[in-house]
Amino acid sequence: KEAVRLIRKSAVQGNAGAQFNLGTRYITGHGVIQDYTRAFTMFQAAAEQGLALAQFNLGLHYFKGRGVDRDDTQSYMWLEVSRLNGYANAVETINIVANKLTGSDVAKAKDLARECFDKKFKGC
């Protein structure tokens, strides 16, 4: 309980690593009540600070509809952002999501990802 309290405090103060850690705990229910919506919120906060693994997890949440409405275009966009930001393991998942989209939707998602990357992940 003390560990979760300290992680939560650090997350509220804007620490991206703590936000990611807390998001992961909300998925697993480790030390907190499982809550995909809160997990999504924590991953979003960390993703906007440039944490590639959080960006990848946002993409997964959009793909699975966990804590957010399912949206394959947003999923692809965040997965691509994580790849552009150095998370090479995103490629396999990007290909899976791409199979759910039309060619024009993939192009749109790639454009959104590039815009997001260029804006330093703010307001994506």
Question: What does each of the following model-derived ranges do?
Answer:
Residues 3-11:
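N-terminal segments that cap or nucleate solenoid repeat domains
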Residues 6, 19-28, 32, 42, ...:
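Hydrophobic face of amphipathic alpha-helices that form TPR/SEL1-like repeat modules
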Residues 10, 25, 46, 61, ...:
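TPR/TPR-like alpha-solenoid repeats
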Residues 12-15, 28-30, 35, 48-51, ...:
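Short helix-capping/linker turns of helical repeat alpha-solenoids
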Residues 23, 55, 59, 70-79:
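Predominantly extracellular beta-rich ligand-binding scaffolds that present long acidic/polar faces
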Residues 88-124:
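Terminal, low-structured helical/coil segments at or just beyond the last alpha-helical repeat
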